[in-house]
Amino acid sequence: MNKNIYALCLLVFLGQNVFAQSNEFEEIIVTATKTEKTLQEVPVAVSVISADEVDKANIVDAFDLMQVVPSLDTRQYQTSRNAAFFIRGFGNGSNNNGVEPSVALFIDGVYRSKMQGRISDLPMVERIEVLRGPQSTLFGKNATAGVINIITKKPSFENFGKLSASLGNYNSRKYKAYYTGPLNDQVAYSFSADTHKADGHAKNTVTGGDTNNRDRYSLRADFLIEAADDLEIRVTADYDEYDEFCCQIGNVSVGPGKQAVYALGAQASPNDPFTDQVHYNFDPIATGENSGITINLVKEMDNMTFTSITSSRDSDSFEYTDIDFDSANMLYNETNVNLSAKSQEFRLASKGNEKFNWLLGAYFYQEDADNDSAVIFAGPAWRAYADILALGATQGAFDMAAVGAALGVPSSLIFATGQGSTGIFTQETDTTSFFGQIDINLSEKLTAILGASYIEDEKKATGVDVNTDIFSQIGLVGAGTIGFIQAGFDPATAAALAANPAVNRLLGFRAFQFLPRMQPFPNVGESGQSKDDNVDYTAKLTYLVNDNISVYGGISTGFKS
């Protein structure tokens, strides 16, 4: 568990980006501070992308936002699920499923904690707000680099429908359907469906298949209930699924190990990270599905507004990947990830007081994550690969069979097909946050903003390693004794070791011991639990120069769990 706090000082002259075409300045309403304000009033570096701009720029998913948002970067890693957002160069990406991103993403106020819940195509949006810099005061943990806040279009009491289709290169086909209208005087609804298919831009020379393709679809139902003049309830259910071959891996350098791959008669990726070819002995499978339901309640009172956002989400993914990334049948990785999350947020916000406006809130988040990941020796090519490297490293002195004989390990048990390591992990996360912010109007043009939040984040994890890789469990340092050398090799080697233990040539084989047996946890030395808490804050001054220009400066902190 890592906890990082950092601050940013901002001084921005009209520092907001609005992607909308108009002949005159348009008043843009945003919820970057969890209350509706004009863009000019918000002392945050924020880019606002309207629904029209989403269509014009052909923004399909959150990753496409980098085309129109300054300082936002997206990166794809080993599988569809392993991707990351970066804002101003800050972010993180990892194949570790327990790692949470540093850029928080919200859809209609609901936090999507892991990348596998973020990769679906966008629904019908009202606008998208990208906030730069730490936003933990109002948005909670893991908003240290910034926030992507997606607001979808509410159902309308006027009938409206939309069909769209687009075709592109790599046989890209995108189809979307949306319809909204009233059920009665108090209930409006909307339904949407979309599908996105495209051939991959990388060709697998072994199977003939495509890699980095697209095969996704999603469904969404939305109901808006105006239960009373002062009470609005919105219920949203969504489902999305992807079934793809991902991802292409390119080499940035070619090391000695690559020559061993060629010696096996196999193909490997060239020294070109931009190659459009891969040489996997099977197509890498990446599948997943996400579903959820959200209830958003807004109650208007005399001097304040009460908001409740309740959500339950589930996410499952499966990956089957050739992790030697060449045509030799050596290693594969199989990963299953299951996530279940529930969240509840309550907010009270004042209404339009001339002197000051305030916001108070509480947030509760609970997530269960199960992750099973296996690295398996896929076939005899792994043993043959190790033999080539062993003979080369010892100038032909011994291969893996000779090492096994000296260690007393039957040759047939070293890197046998089917051996490997399977890690079975669980993680429970409970997060509680209380937050508040007040805007004090010092004059008609000068406003002070003060905010603070308390965040408590508790995690409980378990881990078990089912390991059948015998070679990784051998202590090669201890095995390299004079007695061992005398028993297994020539006297000259024994004499050299006696004079200088550093010449123990067995130590070079530790590179093959990349699957050491993990100690199960919790255990005596590791509780498998962590509990962090932090107080975040923001303090800013904003000055309205005129109707089109504002100046602000301040400091904000962030919390990373």
Regions found by a protein language model. Give the residues of each.
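Outer-membrane beta-barrel strand-turn architecture
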Residues: K154, P182-D185, I225-L231, E300-N303, ...
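Outer-membrane beta-barrel translocator/receptor signature
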Residues: A83, E100-S102, K114, P123-E126, ...
